[in-house]
Swiss-Prot record:
Organism listed in the record: Danio rerio
Name assigned to this protein: tRNA N6-adenosine threonylcarbamoyltransferase
UniProt GO MF annotations: metal ion binding; N(6)-L-threonylcarbamoyladenine synthase activity
Top-level taxon of origin: Eukaryota
Catalytic activities: L-threonylcarbamoyladenylate + adenosine(37) in tRNA = N(6)-L-threonylcarbamoyladenosine(37) in tRNA + AMP + H(+)
Cofactor remark from the record: Binds 1 divalent metal cation per subunit.
Subunit text: Component of the EKC/KEOPS complex composed of at least tp53rk, tprkb, osgep and lage3; the whole complex dimerizes.
GO CC annotations, alphabetized: cytoplasm; EKC/KEOPS complex; nucleus
Annotated PROSITE patterns: GLYCOPROTEASE
Keywords: Acyltransferase, Cytoplasm, Metal-binding, Nucleus, Transferase, tRNA processing
Family: Belongs to the KAE1 / TsaD family.
């Protein structure tokens, strides 16, 4: 039996989760929410995380019914992510590991999403679409690496959606992406937007620039509604994602798709991906917002896999990095 506690705080979510041999014992989380029209700055986000992290830690232990002595390993997000929030979490994780006398493990945030998705859905060897505010990648496992077959060449799809939400002042509570999804359901007019796919790579900066420039003019002249813009943006960027995922599946000979990351809990994206999978005779796997959105349990799960395969992060090496690619990690726990 191996019990791992995971600390996640790479962006505006702070979460601490506990995993015991594939069972989620606890997974509390807090979100730093800013006013409509604003994003979240690293310093202010880190300040929020510092104010709640010890409370979340106590909640995680209480919900799991565990004490420090029961924990076998402390895992934390090493990167990628925003510098100040990552530092906040790493400092607490290092301190806890030393106070409790437990080994420490730095975890790649992207690997955390993948391993949590595999655990929850029981997907065996899927092509992974990883979509969030900071990342957009199409990934498949090969020879001890999660290989990146396609990715954004500029901004992430979640960042595109978030920045559009700021333009038309959509609420950040509970998240801009969720509110765009709800508004898109009421849209009934499709506005043609730039569509940029290059092989298995995508670009979202052009579509964002176009819609940022055109939104107020179109809305002020009654050419469309905010709901129409949300609908059109979603349909366009999700079609791009489905296209590159299908291309990667064909390249890899895969019959499974796993969607992970915060944008992955969007039901319209899952629906569109499901149509493509059905036409190919493939299967789609996805999780709900409990595990798609950044959380501590995903770091604990990746840490559990790493710890059991012999990984440990020594204290002098327990730094953080804002840039940490998925394919940099040797995946020693898979055949």
């Amino acid at each position: 039996m191996t019990i791992v506690i995971g600390f996640e705080g790479s962006a505006n979510k702070i979460g601490i989760g506990i995993i015991k041999d594939g069972e989620v014992l606890s997974n509390p989380r807090r979100t730093y929410i800013t006013p409509p029209g604003q994003g979240f700055l690293p310093g202010e986000t880190a300040k929020h995380h510092r104010s709640v992290i010890l409370t979340v830690l106590q909640e995680a232990l209480d919900e799991a019914g565990l004490k420090a002595a029961d924990i076998d390993c402390v895992a934390y997000t090493k990167g990628p992510g925003m510098g100040a929030p990552l530092v906040t979490v790493a400092i607490v994780a290092r301190t806890v590991a030393q106070l409790w006398g437990k080994p420490l493990l730095g975890v790649n945030h992207c690997i955390g999403h993948i391993e949590m998705g595999r655990l929850i859905t029981n997907a065996q060897n899927p092509t992974v679409l990883y979509v969030s505010g900071g990342n957009t990648q199409v990934i498949a496992y090969s020879e001890r690496r999660y290989r990146i077959f396609g990715e954004t060449i500029d901004i992430a799809v979640g960042n595109c959606l978030d920045r559009f939400a700021r333009v038309i002042k959509i609420s950040n509570d509970p998240s801009p992406g969720y509110n765009i999804e709800q508004m898109a359901k009421k849209g009934n007019k499709y506005i043609e937007l730039p569509y940029t796919v290059k092989g298995m790579d995508v670009s979202f900066s052009g579509i964002l620039s176009y819609i940022e420039d055109a939104a107020h003019k179109m809305l002020s002249t009654d050419q469309c509604t905010p709901e129409d813009l949300c609908f059109s943006l979603q349909e366009t960027v999700f079609a791009m994602l489905v296209e590159i995922t299908e291309r990667a599946m064909a390249h890899c000979g895969s019959q499974e798709v796993l969607i992970v990351g915060g944008v992955g809990c969007n039901l319209r994206l899952q629906e569109m991906m499901g149509v493509m999978c059905k036409e190919r005779g493939a299967r789609i796997f996805a999780t709900d917002e409990s595990f798609c959105i950044d959380n501590g349990a995903m770091i604990a799960q990746a840490g559990w896999e790493m710890f059991r395969s012999g990984h440990v992060t020594e204290l002098p090496d327990s730094w953080i990095t804002q840039r940490y690619r998925t394919d940099e990690v040797e995946v020693t726990w898979r055949d």
